[in-house]
Amino acid sequence: MRKIKGIVITTLLLAFASGPEGSAQQTGIGYKPATDADSKKTILLKDFQPEPALHASVHEIPRAKFPVIDVHTHTNDAVGIGDRVDPKEMVARMDRLNIKTIVILTGMWGDKLQTIIDNMVKPYPGRFVVFTQFDWSKINDPNFSQLMVRQIDDSVARGARGLKVLKELGLGVRDSTGKLILIDDSRLDPAWEECGRLGIPVFIHVADPEAFFHPIDARNERYEELIEHPDWSFYGRQFPSLQELVAQRDRMFAKHPRTMFVALHFGSWPENLDFVEQTLQKFPNVMIETGAREAELGRQPRRTREIFMTYSDRIMFGTDEGAGEAMYQNYFRWLETKDEYFPYAQYPLQGRWMIYGLGLPDDVLEKVYHGNAEALFARFKGGGNN
């Protein structure tokens, strides 16, 4: 009996002495990496589509809690940026989602603007708002400033309720000498002032995501997006930096305090929310909106929520993401719930991360969804026939 006990104890001691590796050899569980691991790391990036194993709560939001004004769309626009949807079907879709109004930003001017007004604005009162734009083909005309003021007046008389400026200002529009037109170019001053006189807002897209100004390489967090759209890259000496562009923009904001500006895409730099907050503090004539920046904001939910809570009177709901119902429902989930680690709505892929819900309180939701936009458009002083 004493001999058997000794054998058992000796066996146990040997097992413990051998450590986890020794026991693993018997069970098939390993504690050392495979010697051929490096040779297996050859999966193509496009084929790497991991499915999260996280078991997180899911709260689907099929319909917004409060009526919504989407201030950033291009649906049935004059430029051809947005989705083409039959207006009657679009209204039915909006009703299902609790969307009160959508703003079509790229309406151009003249006959093209009139077509949108005749086909969408007039037949469906209150459901569609359309903006006008600059005609850059006239930039070299010595009377450019006066021509744009007259064009804005004509557009407003037709029914336009704002001016939209695409990112081409500062990045693409050039004069006859090849020189880029700066955002704070003095030739634009009369147009900004005219918008203030009429009480219509200027929605301006300045720069683009910060990653678009970085090299397209393995360190760029939006590599896949830029490979798909290399024309979205603004890296190189032929382009001004993001910092230079927002500096031009800020000089323009300061020069025209009586004009209301909306700094699209959450103030032009959502990767830097301290900068966005400084913009709002510095310029009382500036508002922001959420268009196409759910991904950027959703990955930094605590700081983003602070901005929403502190500046709840200055933020509007915008998408800039087509007209799909699932897209809208994803935005609603992001704003209304506290769900964790779920996909953002935008396509193409912006970056390999997930987002987190903000869980905004009702009073803030109402302002963001419709209250702030209603207050902005209520500043209209007349000048149109509609």
Which residue ranges define each predicted feature?
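Hydrophobic faces of well-ordered beta-strands that scaffold small-molecule active sites
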Residues: 68-73, 101-104, 129-133, 163-165, ...
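Bacterial N-terminal signal peptides
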Residues: 7-19
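Divalent metal-dependent hydrolysis catalytic cores, especially in the metallo-beta-lactamase
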Residues: 73-74, 83, 89-111, 128-135, ...
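Active-site gating/metal-coordination segments in enzymes
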Residues: 33-50, 113-232
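Acidic (Asp/Glu)-rich catalytic clusters
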Residues: 58-63, 90-96, 115-128, 150-160, ...
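H/E-rich (His + Asp/Glu) clusters that bind or coordinate divalent metals
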Residues: 237-386
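Acidic-and-aromatic substrate-binding clefts and catalytic sites of carbohydrate-active enzymes
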Residues: 76-85, 105-114, 137-146, 173, ...
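Mature N-terminal segment immediately following signal peptide/propeptide cleavage
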Residues: 54-88, 92, 370
